[in-house]
Amino acid sequence: PGSCTVYMARRSLLFSPADRPELMRKGPDSGADIIASDLEDAVAPAHKATAREGLVTLLSDPDFDPDCEVCVRVNSDPDVAEMDLKALLGAEKPVRLDSIMLPKAETAADIDQLVTAISEYNTERPILAICESAAGVLHAQEIAAHDAVDCLLFGAEDLSADIGAKRTES
């Protein structure tokens, strides 16, 4: 009696640029626990609309049903993220989208803003928040404590740039 929730381990994450949906289609073959299509840094501004269209085509394909978590990294700019969400969650056909990644999360208010935007489509998705700035690191505990946040990630490259650190090879 009762119910049991089974959680998949998140040991590995494979990113692919959203303007290359064929790479995401191959992602499950990598054995990664999460495959994430990146609409933010990996796609030039001039290609974002086309990237969204191709991504929605892939994620609404009934033949695309991998045995791993399917995530999309939306844009950090709220206006551009809204266009991402409209394409994904407002699509004519249902899309395979298990979670949404929020880059450059700096406070719990950033999470609130994304949750509100997602709720406009009468749905919920777990949020994978990326702390990529000094402010994000300072507020990591409040970000991680947000009910909608399922996972907290650390973005070393953008953090290094934010604090003016010089990356060195080891």
Where are these regions (language model features)?
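Conserved alpha/beta-domain cores
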Residues: 6-170
